[in-house]
Each structure stands twice: as structure tokens, then as C-alpha cells.
Curated annotation (Swiss-Prot):
Residues annotated for FMN binding in this entry: 74-79, 121-124, 157-166
Protein's name according to its UniProt entry: Sulfite reductase [NADPH] flavoprotein alpha-component
Residues annotated as binding FAD: 327, 361, 391-394, 409-411, 415, 424-427, 604
UniProt pathway: Sulfur metabolism; hydrogen sulfide biosynthesis; hydrogen sulfide from sulfite (NADPH route): step 1/1
Domain Flavodoxin-like: 68-206
Organism: Aliivibrio fischeri (strain ATCC 700601 / ES114)
Gene: cysJ
Cofactor notes: Binds 1 FAD per subunit. Binds 1 FMN per subunit.
One GO term of the biological process aspect: hydrogen sulfide biosynthetic process
Cofactor: FAD; FMN
Domain FAD-binding FR-type: 239-453
Length: 604
């Protein structure tokens, strides 16, 4: 409400007080106004609530409270979630706190800060998340300011199965230290089961921040500052998922396809959950009871043994099915089991980081345990395992099209290991173990780094081979329902046209109606020489360049290991050739597209 409107309402202030407020407000920025509102609220809760306005204004200007700034660099939302929890805990502890998306934070402002915590995930091959590219580059440039007065902490999130584990967090730590900043707490690098150690680190960090701020400004009125960007609110979350209903699980690859890809439909009716194109759905799943039994047999346990999980005593069998990751191996598991079993093969792998990473990334837990049989205690077994985490799937529907449903495109992991068939955890849960009508626990993971342009007239280029097509089904449904005038160009690729053309009928319908203006496909095994989406991009290089000149946004979804790199290289070649630029200039041009959010990727 504007201050000038106060006089027309039943206000407890007299005209002189209103005039004083108007005068003070005219000289303050929006952030300062928000601070003042919190300051006055704090005064109202104390015995000094009758302090005159002019005295309060003087207090605001002469005794600003120290604050903690939290910056999150997040690709899929995990780092954002940790940062939001940190912000809430700081506010509850009476610490003035402000939360920033890294894309909204200007690096030069660090010189004015006293206490900062950065929560950073790592994208692809050690790259900064899209929302942190600009800040990441700034801090390693000559423009980075001296930060002698800054005290900082860093939480890195990652997956130890990858070579550049928590690299972005390590980078920020190094950048800040180089500029003279002092860590008030040691950086922590957290694996996929990060929740418990992250909570402990947050507690330690906030204890140190509270003590430091108290000593800096004993008399300052501590208030809570606003979050830099409004967060999505819902009663359901990763920690409190919604129990939804599976409506459909339909195979959409041909009977002779080497792949089993499912179109999944889930009912959200009554949940209040909302999502936008580009968001992901988190799915909590249960492990295969048969796999749990096989693991127990391999290590000489029955499953009846009691183990403590989250303060509760449950059977080991139940723990393996519901609480622990028993499908995918990881380097730590391989290294620890090498010690427990005395396996020479595993010991040799553990001594070579590259081979260890490759082995653990392509091997399931049961196959690691089968390298050499060893009898374990229940505690030793669960000590080897990570906690179960939900799987995130790109949402393949627009809510403007499907209303109270959410659709997924799930590639079922299934392959032979010797004489045994191995299955993926979440994908086999959704495709084989759940029946239509069964419950499934889900939550929405918002992704602000993969969003359609706000301008409906902007052209869009979508590159999504395989199940990477999922978000683009959502994009096109949304653009259709919004009557967006912008052109849409889809690149899709897979193995065989007759077996693996996902949602073929839908794309042909959209092409015929003009919603999709151009569709280019690459089926790698339909000819002797393999053809992939990056080849189609290069074939249409002149047209791609023209679309970029017309303001097109480029989106890439799918495999990070090869496809995303090859597409990135193809885009650089397009810019170099048709933009008449040097290689270095072309790389910079593509990088500027990313900074401007005109080149967005959801790769995994």
C-alpha cells in the first residue's frame, strides 16, 4: 500500500507522522524499504514499541544490522533447496539473511559483504550451473574485487561417480580465497546423499555467523531480509512428497526396438501441485525385493537383522528396499568393499581413479559384491550403501494441456550381466513393479534454468534425442495453448525410424497444423553411416544461424557425456562459419547466448 493512501484510510498515524514516513520513504531504495519494514516490526515486538518515528529512522541509518547473504548456483534445484533451508534456519536463529539466485547477484557486491555462503552444484564436466556462469567468470576475471573484509563458506554438491566432483564449489572457494576473503568454516563437498551432512554443516556455519554478527553489531536490530526471488510454495516437497496415482504406463517404442521407453501418466488431482514446462518430477521409488534378497544372500545375511535408520529400528530387508541405494554402485562403495573383501581386482581398481570411476559408473552393487564373496555384518552392509534418493525426470506435459496430470518419458534400464538381467531402480519401479492405480510418491522440482522465453514471438530451437524429447513435448503443448506466434524447430534423434520415433503421431500432427514449423530427425542405424542430431544441425547451419540472428532460443536435453558436447561443438561451428568469426569469437558468442538464457541445457 502506498504511503499517500494512508490518510484516506483508518490509520493510527497522524498527519505529521505520515509526512515523516513519506519523506523517509522517498529517500530509500526498495531493499532499504523492506529492511525498514522488518526493523519497525521488530520494534513493535519489544517494550520500546512506542519509540518515535524520527528516532527509529535515526537508528536505522546509524545502526544497520549485519547480515548473511546466501547465493545458490543450482542446475536441477538441489543446491537451491539447501540454500532455502539455510535461509529459513538463519532467520529462525535471528540472523538477518538474504537469499540470491546466482544469476541475480552482481559479483562486485561481494566487496560490500561481510558474510556470504555459496551453495553450488556442478554441471556436466565440472562446469558451473547455467545460473552461475556469469558470477563464476567474473570471479576469475581481472574485474574481481579485493575481498579482504569478506568471510565466507561454501557447500559443494555433486556425485562422486563423476570426475569433477563438486568442482564448482571448489572453484568458488579458490576464487574467493585468491581475492583475500577468509573462510569462516571449511568447505564441504557432499555426495548424492547430502541431506544429513548438509544439515550438520548448516548448523555449524550458522553458529559461527551468529556469533560473528553479534560481536560486530551488539546494538543492531536484527531483522529478516526478503528473498531475492520469490520461491515456489507448496506443502509437498522432496522431504514431504505427494502420494499420487499411476494412471498409465505405456510402451512407446516398437516391439522390435532395442529400447523400452514408457509414456507415464500420473494423477495429481487435489494435490495443488503446479509445474511449468522445463520443470522435473521427483519420484521416490522402492527397490526390488528380489534384488535386496540377492544382496543379502551374497553377504551371508538373512534380512531379519535389525538396523537403525533415522532413529528407528527396522529390519535389514526393509531398509534395503525402502531406505538405501542398492542399484547403482559408486567409487566409495567399491573402495570400501575392496578393503572388506580383500578382492585384488577391486583393490587395483581403487588405486586408479579413472578406472574406478568408469567401473563404478557402469556396475551395479550386486556385481561389485560378486567380485569376491565376503560375509558382512548388517552394519557393514548399510555402511557401504548410500541413502536412497529420488530420481528426477523431465516433465513431458504442459499443465495447460493436461490439467491435474503430469506426464513423463522414461527409458527403462535393462541389460544382461552374464546370465543375469539387471534393471534400473526407478525406471523398473515405474514400468514393471507398479500397476495402474498404484500409489507413487512425487514432488515437483522447479528448474528456472530451462524455461521458455517470456516473449511468445521468440523463435525456439529444441534439440532432444531419445528421452531428451520429454521437455519439448511440454514446450510445444504450452506454446500451442498460449497461441504463441514464435516459430518452433525440433531436432530429434534415435536408432531406428520405425521402432524409436517417440511421439511420432503427435509431432506429425503439430507439423501439419503449423505449431512445429520444422522437424529434422536423425536415426543412427537406418543407414550404414551413423547420423546424429549434431549432423542435422550442421546440414542446416545457415538456417540455424539465421534463426539465431532472429533472436531464437536454443534448448538441449539429454545425454551429457557425448550428445551435449557434440551439439555444443556443432553450434560453435555454425557461428564460426556463418557468423564469419574466429574460433575464439564463436565460443564467446555461444557463451553470451548462455548468459542471456538464449542457450539452455538440461543434460544428465
Amino acid at each position: 500500500m502506498l504511503l499517500k493512501e494512508l490518510s484516506a484510510l483508518a490509520s493510527p498515524l497522524n498527519d505529521q507522522q505520515i509526512g515523516q514516513l513519506q519523506q523517509a520513504a522517498s529517500e530509500l531504495s526498495p531493499q532499504q524499504l523492506a529492511w525498514v519494514s522488518g526493523y519497525f516490526w521488530g520494534i513493535s515486538q519489544t517494550s520500546g514499541a512506542t519509540q518515535p518515528i524520527n528516532q527509529a529512522a535515526a537508528a536505522v541509518s546509524s545502526q544497520p544490522a549485519g547480515k548473511l547473504s546466501i547465493i545458490f548456483a543450482s542446475q536441477t534445484g538441489n543446491a537451491k533447496g539447501v540454500a532455502e533451508a539455510l535461509k529459513e534456519e538463519a532467520a529462525a536463529a535471528g540472523i538477518a539473511v538474504e537469499l540470491f539466485d546466482a544469476s541475480d547477484y552482481k559479483g562486485k557486491h561481494l566487496a560490500k559483504e561481510t558474510h556470504v555462503i555459496i551453495v553450488a552444484s556442478t554441471n556436466g564436466e565440472g562446469e558451473a550451473p547455467d545460473n552461475a556462469i556469469e558470477l563464476h567468470e567474473f570471479l576469475q576475471s581481472k574485474k574481481a574485487p579485493k575481498l579482504d573484509n569478506l568471510h565466507y563458506g561454501v557447500i559443494g554438491l555433486g556425485d562422486s561417480s563423476y570426475e569433477f566432483f563438486c568442482q564448482t564449489g571448489k572453484d568458488f572457494d579458490a576464487f574467493l580465497s585468491k581475492q583475500g576473503a577468509t573462510p569462516f568454516i571449511e568447505r564441504v563437498d557432499l555426495d548424492v546423499d547430502y541431506e544429513a551432512p548438509a544439515a550438520e554443516w548448516r548448523k555449524q556455519a550458522l553458529d559461527k555467523v551468529k556469533e560473528a554478527l553479534a560481536s560486530e553489531a551488539q546494538s543492531a536490530q536484527v531483522v529478516q531480509l526478503p528473498v531475492g526471488q520469490a520461491a515456489h510454495t507448496s506443502q509437498y516437497s522432496k522431504q514431504n512428497p505427494y502420494t499420487a496415482t499411476l494412471l498409465t504406463s505405456q510402451k512407446i517404442t516398437g516391439r522390435d526396438s532395442g529400447k523400452d521407453v514408457r509414456h507415464i501418466e500420473i494423477d495429481l488431482d487435489g494435490s495443488g501441485l503446479t509445474y511449468q514446462p522445463g520443470d522435473a518430477l521427483g519420484v521416490w521409488f522402492e527397490n526390488s525385493p528380489e534384488l535386496a534378497s540377492a544382496i543379502l544372500k551374497q553377504v551371508g545375511l538373512t534380512g531379519d537383522e535389525a538396523v537403525e535408520v533415522d532413529g528407528d529400528s527396522i529390519s535389514l530387508q526393509k531398509a534395503l528396499v525402502e531406505k538405501y541405494e542398492i542399484t547403482s554402485a559408486n567409487p566409495q562403495l567399491v573402495t570400501q568393499y575392496a578393503e572388506l573383501s580383500g578382492s585384488k581386482k577391486l583393490e587395483k581398481l581403487a588405486a586408479d581413479k579413472d578406472k574406478l570411476r568408469q567401473y563404478s559408473g557402469n556396475t551395479q552393487v550386486i556385481d561389485v559384491l560378486s567380485e569376491k564373496k565376503a560375509k558382512l555384518t548388517a552394519e557393514q552392509l548399510v555402511g557401504l550403501l548410500r541413502r536412497l534418493t529420488p530420481r528426477l525426470y523431465s516433465i513431458a506435459s504442459s499443465q495447460s494441456e493436461v490439467d491435474e496430470e503430469v506426464h513423463l518419458t522414461v527409458g527403462v534400464v535393462e541389460y544382461l550381466q552374464g546370465d543375469e538381467t539387471r534393471f534400473g531402480g526407478a525406471s523398473s519401479f515405474l514400468s514393471h513393479r507398479l500397476e495402474e492405480g498404484d500409489d507413487v510418491k512425487v514432488f515437483v522440482e522447479h528448474n528456472n534454468n530451462f524455461k521458455l522465453p517470456q516473449d511468445d514471438n521468440a523463435p525456439v530451437i529444441m534439440i532432444g534425442p531419445g528421452t531428451g524429447i520429454a521437455p519439448f513435448r511440454s514446450f510445444v503443448q504450452e506454446r500451442d495453448n498460449r497461441d504463441a506466434e514464435g516459430k518452433n524447430w525440433l531436432f530429434f534423434g534415435d536408432r531406428i525410424f520405425t521402432q524409436d520415433f517417440l511421439y511420432q503421431v503427435e509431432w506429425q500432427k503439430y507439423l501439419k497444423s503449423g505449431i512445429v514449423n520444422q522437424l529434422d530427425v536423425a536415426f543412427s542405424r537406418d543407414q550404414q553411416e551413423k547420423v546424429y542430431v549434431q549432423h542435422r544441425i550442421l546440414e542446416h547451419a545457415a538456417q540455424v544461424w539465421q534463426w539465431l540472428q532472429d533472436g531464437a532460443y536454443i534448448y538441449v536435453c539429454g545425454d551429457a557425456t557425448r550428445m551435449a558436447k557434440d551439439v555444443h561443438e556443432a553450434l560453435i561451428c555454425v557461428v564460426e562459419q556463418h557468423g564469419q568469426k574466429t574460433r575464439e569469437e564463436a565460443e564467446q558468442f555461444v557463451n553470451e547466448l548462455r548468459k542471456a538464457k538464449r542457450y539452455q541445457r538440461d543434460v544428465y
